[in-house]
A protein has these predicted regions:
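N-terminal low-complexity, acidic/polar interaction/targeting segments
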Residues: 1-213
């Protein structure tokens, strides 16, 4: 049976994925009220992408994990964490912030044997990415992921457009997200390796001309 509920809504120009941390600077009065109400009721709020005037209907619940900083004027810096996904059925006004009647949803299928194979392929490719960029300095970070969580992590590092990130958020299987991430990451790593080769060739030529001159 599909679970439903009513949650506060926080439209943002960002796509939040499950398990993804999201720091926020809260300064508008309506969102100060939202955070205050969520803390008082120990409740999550929903992050929805708003892009080019469009408010998307599928989003991710955010749980307030920590209050990082409080300011004298009431502003807050908070750290949130993406939880389960939801679909808005009805937007409601009446409070300082929007609320939504939502249904919570997750992937339609269980993890298939193909997911583990994709997971291993992407994991190997990610090591190349880490060496090329230095962005992932702690190898245990990746080791702790499940294929489900890893499929969302890939969307974060692949530098997709907002609309593409939204499409990935709305995918209903880890296998589909991993396959998409593998294709994009392979292209990215290949391009980075080519850039390195070109830089080396140009550097060698520069050194050669300097010697000749």
């Amino acid at each position: 049976m599909t679970e439903t509920g009513t949650i506060p809504l926080f439209p943002l120009n960002v796509v939040l994925f499950p398990h993804q941390p999201l720091p926020l600077h809260i300064f508008e009065p309506r969102y100060k009220a939202l955070v205050r109400d969520c803390l008082a009721a120990d409740k999550d709020f929903g992050v929805l992408l708003v892009h080019q005037g469009q408010l998307f209907q599928n989003g991710t619940c955010a749980r307030i994990e920590n209050i990082l900083e409080k300011f004298d004027d009431g502003r807050l810096k908070i750290l949130t964490l993406g939880k389960r996904r939801f679909r808005v059925k009805k937007v409601m006004e009446g409070k300082p912030y929007l609320e939504g009647e939502v249904e919570f949803w997750d992937d339609e299928t269980d993890l298939s044997p193909g997911v583990e194979a994709l997971f291993r392929q992407v994991h190997t490719l990610l090591k190349d990415y880490a060496q090329l960029t230095g962005k992932i300095t702690d190898p245990t970070l990746v080791e702790n992921f499940t294929p489900y969580g890893f499929s969302f992590f890939l969307a974060e590092i692949n530098m997709y457009s907002l609309t593409r990130q939204q499409e990935i958020l709305e995918m209903t299987s880890a296998e589909e997200r991993l396959a998409c991430g593998l294709k994009s990451l392979a292209h990215l790593v290949s391009r980075m390796k080519l850039d390195q080769k070109l830089q080396k060739i140009l550097g060698d030529r520069h050194s050669f001309f300097n010697i000749c001159n």
